[in-house]
Amino acid sequence: MVSLTKRVLFEVIPNPPDETTLTLSSTTNKGHYISVRPFVNAEGKEFPFEWAFGGTSDHIELKKINERANSLNFNFKFDTNVKLNVPETHRGVIKTVFKTWDSGLVEETGSVFPWGTEGTEVKFRELWQPVDPTRLEFVELNNEKDVDQAANSIALSVDNEEYEGLVIVVGRWIQGILFKKGVNTLDGINLFRSQIDEKNSIVSLVKFGADADKFPQEVLLNEGSITTSKGLEWSVIESNL
């Protein structure tokens, strides 16, 4: 099921909750996913993101707990913290539980181990508001299941000797991660968030990185298609067009 959710609360327990980003997480019908988390106030920040990560359906395990809750175990293919070798960064599987409230908000709980699996467990909690991916403005959905099943669900990927990346399209919203292999600095990280307007043109909202112009300029493509941007070939690994 296509999903676009906006984070409205982040809490590292036992600290008080807060939200300093405009975080959106996108998931396609087949389970390919990406989360891009730019700071609302990025002034003075060399890297204006709290975090960004993503992966294909091979990098997530979902199990149903009951009608309202699922366990999701993530093992990200793309993780900016790992890419940058940020100290005290969790590596490996992150176990989470997603529970839908009566209001339609989705609570995510889980824990990470920044000092390794033998180190101290750090618990966290996030709250997500499902939004309509077919709209250019943020329109809240009463329930994530209310999303238009005909909404665009497209994923593009690249993996060659120099680059690896993933782009997710849900409805009118596009998010992408592109890493330059072997470059574990900000020079090796590219992120973007865009929208598809009424004329099917791509309008950039967030763009970061020296190679950000290599993100695909056309995304409304059939599965199996190839598109090239600034010499970089992207393969469409999922499309419902």
From Swiss-Prot:
Question: One GO CC term of this entry?
Answer: cytoplasm
Keywords of the record, alphabetical order, are: Cytoplasm, Nucleus
> Do the record's keywords include Transferase?
no
Which CDD domains does the protein's record reference?
Answer: HRI1_C_like, HRI1_N_like
The cross-references to InterPro entries, in alphabetical order and at most eight, read:
Hri1, Hri1_N, Hri1_N_sf
User: One of this protein's Pfam families, by short name?
Assistant: HRI1
Task: Kindly list the places in or outside the cell where this protein is found, as annotated in its UniProt entry.
Answer: Cytoplasm; Nucleus
Chief location = cytoplasm
Gene3D superfamilies named in the record: Protein HRI1, C-terminal domain (2.40.128.310), Protein HRI1, N-terminal domain (2.40.128.320)
Regarding protein family, the annotation reads:
Belongs to the HRI1 family.
Could you tell me what this protein is called?
Answer: Protein HRI1
**What is the name of the gene encoding this protein?**
HRI1
